[in-house]
Amino acid sequence: EKSHLSFSVKMRLGWEDKEEWKPVLDLLNNIPLKQITLHPRIGTQQYKGKVDMESFDAFYNTCKHSLIYNGDLTTIEDIHRIENSYPKLAGIMIGRGLLARPTLSAEYASGKEYSEAERRNLLHAMHDRLIAHYETTANSEAQIHSRMRLFWEYMETEIGRKVYKKIMKAGNLKNYLNAVREI
């Protein structure tokens, strides 16, 4: 009996070597997959250094499946660059870029980059909704504080180093909220 499920693969170029993808893709090209998402780095690199666009280009030209690009997309320009360079892509995955700039997908969809003031206002609105949710689900102010600090983990560039450090060093919810008001 056939299953209604489809399978996708998310992968990097390799673990230690940027050529490790080649024999893997030979196998993947011969099995039924919905899509492949490629992050063009090697595993040992984690998120350090640059993505390897030369290797992505080779993968793109060899892959027989629908392909999704993933890696280092933090601006609308980054998205357009990938979109224009690889017109046969099935999609683009935004990971840490969206965590660092939560308005990025909305900016892309609207076709315009938001002003700093617009981004800050939307960031505060999102933050306030999240705080309100945690106030109804968390057991204590300490839990709310702990969870909310994670909200800012990738946003240092967006909010500035000084206020980011204040948020991270805030020892309790009151000090945390005071630091957030400085954004």
Where in this protein do the model-derived segments appear?
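Flavin-dependent oxidoreductase catalytic cores
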Residues: 1-183
